[in-house]
From Swiss-Prot:
It holds the Pfam family TrkA_C. It is found in: Cell membrane. This is Putative transport protein VS_1837. It comes from Vibrio atlanticus (strain LGP32). One of its GO terms (cellular component) is plasma membrane.
Length: 560
């Protein structure tokens, strides 16, 4: 049996999509030294080649791809979006605005000067900033009629120009941002590690980027004469065992009766006590606890140690420091703090925001008691609330249909902004109501990534047919402008942050990369700083930058 592969792919668009995705994702794993191409570039390269070979793609699939992507971006931003302006919030907003306003101005004037075709400039700007939301916003403005297509062009040609501009500029934007992260600290003679240490001392944060996480363990000891001598008649509160070692007494057996001791309890000879703590905490116990006194008793040691992810919800906790939680009162152990999917530097003086996720371990009832105080335990269900997911998706589309008229001018939000807003609403409500709108993070990541990959396939196949023609005609101009638009806004943001806002350099670099939403560069800065301190800045600008970039895409295509 003979199979015409070309004909098969042309007649089966779904098969074509997944063939392109499979090849592209494999290419994305290729590394050049420490630089990995990444999924977006791999899929983009593959789809460009396939597009050049004459394969095409259904526009409806492209549309649903970008709609799912932008909706999921909103859901992820929702929990932290309204609390982002705590502490350094105005700085993060200013940096995001500097990057985008400078990029828009440079794109507009350079494109006007060189006479780039309509749509090329918006696509180029999206690629130069490696910001798919810009491309989404621009394309949606065209589809919804917010942006007027020139009379000598049709919508298909403009979308093609968008795709070509994005494809030619994307690699330039990615490489330039990675080079910025590598070179600017050296050229400015900035020691990011010292900057991270400085902010850590000011705010009481840990700087270690490589931290091992253990579960607490339980050990039981019999109280003997040596331990009674050591306690000197003090009660448990006065002894401060937790403050000194990190262990706490979870159970005590006296005269055969098991009980949970309070702070007023005084140890007596013959008591058997169960202590919970990390392995190194047990090692810090006074020798009078351990020397020949360990007890192996099933009932005494039968404690259920759990590890839970607690989402911060309480208004009384948001905006306060981690130390205000008084974890020692609950006998709980903090393993890590995650904000906007970024692991934060962890120590007692970090300021908490709504939507932060605290990974806490300890005896089950104690962990649940802590969760009731600060928020709720993240649902460990694999089932998503598809009713809420779909309902808010519909709401976003309805938002996009709203049109406002000012005199002779009509203006609407469009699908991109509408879905972004409804996604933020769902994410925010989910952070405040644990049983509503739950979507497992893995499922959300898959939908977002798959939507983005569908979108990339459509972009590449649309641009591939004319990519070499455009490269020979305007390739040098587009690549040159892309380099300018990629580098100068970041440089201006650095100057503003360093000299006008006087930001700590470790936070500043993280914030600039967050404003560019460029995760690969974030890893490089963390490596330079030998710390996760820059992640504080990244998390600060990331959510607001995603929102502003979608609006910027709509704006740049309207003024082009």
């Amino acid at each position: 049996m003979n199979i015409d592969v070309v004909l098969l792919l042309k007649q089966n668009p779904i098969l074509l999509i997944f063939v392109v995705l499979s090849i592209g994702l494999a290419i994305g794993k290729i590394r050049f030294g420490s630089l990995q191409l990444g999924n977006s570039i791999g899929v983009l390269i593959t789809s460009l080649i396939m597009g050049h070979l004459g394969f095409s793609f259904n526009a409806d699939a492209l549309t649903i791809g970008f709609m799912l992507f932008i909706y999921c971006v909103g859901i992820e931003a929702g929990p932290n979006f309204f609390g982002i302006f705590f502490r350094d919030g105005k700085h993060y907003l200013i940096l995001s605005l500097v990057v985008l306003s400078t990029a828009i101005a440079l794109t507009y004037f350079c494109s006007e000067y060189l006479g780039l075709g309509f749509g090329l400039s918006a696509g180029m700007m999206a690629g130069a900033l490696t910001a798919t939301p810009i491309l989404v916003g621009a394309q949606d403005a065209l589809n919804s009629g917010l942006a007027e297509v020139p009379r000598n062009m049709d919508l298909g040609l403009v979308i093609e120009n968008l795709s070509v501009g994005y494809a030619m500029a994307y690699l330039v934007g990615l490489i330039s941002m990675i080079m910025f992260a590598r070179l600017i600290p050296k050229l400015q003679k900035v020691n990011l590690h010292d900057s991270a240490e400085q902010i850590a001392q000011e705010r009481g944060l840990g700087t270690s980027g490589q931290r091992k996480v253990y579960l607490p363990i339980i050990r039981a000891y019999r109280v003997g004469p040596e331990l009674i001598t050591w306690t000197d008649g003090k009660n448990l509160r006065e002894l401060g065992i937790y403050r000194q070692t990190g262990c706490y007494i979870e159970r005590i057996r006296r005269n055969g009766i098991l009980a949970h001791p309070d702070g007023d309890a005084i140890l007596q000879e013959g008591d058997e006590i169960a202590l919970v703590g990390f392995p190194d905490s047990h090692a810090r116990l006074d020798p009078s606890f351990r020397n020949g006194k360990e007890v192996f008793d099933r009932n005494l040691l039968d404690l259920r140690i759990v590890e839970e992810e607690i989402v911060v919800k309480s208004d009384n906790i948001a905006g306060k420091r981690l130390s205000d939680l008084n974890l020692s009162e609950y006998g709980c152990f903090l393993n890590r703090v995650v904000r906007a999917q970024i692991e934060m530097p962890m120590d007692l003086n970090i300021v908490l925001s709504k939507g932060d996720v605290l990974q806490v371990s300890g005896e089950k009832s104690r962990v649940h008691g802590l969760a009731e105080k600060i928020g709720f335990i993240s649902i460990h269900s694999q089932m998503a609330d598809l009713t809420a997911f779909c309902s808010f998706f519909i709401l976003g589309i309805l938002f996009g249909l709203i049109t406002m008229t000012f005199g002779q001018v009509s203006f609407g939000l469009g699908n991109a902004v509408g879905l972004l807003l409804s996604g933020i609403m769902l994410g925010f409500l989910r952070a405040n109501h644990p049983t509503f709108g739950y979507v497992p993070q893995g499922a959300l990541n898959m939908v977002k990534d798959l939507g983005l990959m569908f979108f990339m396939v459509g972009i590449g196949l649309s641009a591939g047919g004319k990519i070499f023609e455009h490269l020979t005609q305007v390739g040098p101009q587009v690549i040159g402008i892309a380099l300018i638009v990629s580098v100068l806004p970041v440089f201006f943001a650095y100057l503003v942050g360093a000299y006008a806002l006087k930001m700590n350099r470790a936070l500043l670099f993280g914030a600039i990369i967050g404003a560019r939403t460029c995760a690969p560069a974030m890893d490089i800065v963390n490596d330079h700083a030998r710390s996760t301190i820059p992640a504080l800045g990244y998390a600060g600008t990331y959510a607001i930058a995603n929102i502003l970039m979608t609006l910027a895409g709509t704006f740049i295509i309207i003024i082009s």
